[in-house]
Swiss-Prot record:
Its cofactor is Zn(2+). Belongs to the universal ribosomal protein uS14 family. Zinc-binding uS14 subfamily. GO terms for molecular function: rRNA binding; structural constituent of ribosome; zinc ion binding. PANTHER family: 30S RIBOSOMAL PROTEIN S14 (PTHR19836), SMALL RIBOSOMAL SUBUNIT PROTEIN US14M (PTHR19836:SF19). InterPro entries: Ribosomal_uS14, Ribosomal_uS14_bact, Ribosomal_uS14_CS, Ribosomal_uS14_sf. This is Small ribosomal subunit protein uS14. Binds 1 zinc ion per subunit. Binds 16S rRNA, required for the assembly of 30S particles and may also be responsible for determining the conformation of the 16S rRNA at the A site. The lineage of its organism: Bacteria, Bacillati, Mycoplasmatota, Mycoplasmoidales, Mycoplasmoidaceae. GO terms for biological process: translation. The keyword S-adenosyl-L-methionine does not apply.
Length: 61
């Protein structure tokens, strides 16, 4: 789990736009964030298995 201070710091609008970075909206993880959904791969996997993300299903080929 991410530090509360870093989550709050990231939510503020940065002075320069290059300082902005993606962070998971659900758990606050800074790495492996899927931009389209705004959540990290771990949260994405969890929600996909539960069927909470419409149109996403497990791949099989």
């Amino acid at each position: 789990m991410a530090k509360k201070s870093l989550i709050v710091k990231q939510k503020k609008h940065p002075k320069f736009k290059v300082r902005a970075y993606t962070r998971c909206e659900r758990c606050g993880r800074p790495r492996a964030v899927i931009r389209k959904f705004g959540i990290c791969r771990l949260c994405f996997r969890d929600l996909a298995y539960k069927g909470a993300i419409p149109g996403v299903k497990k791949a099989s080929w």
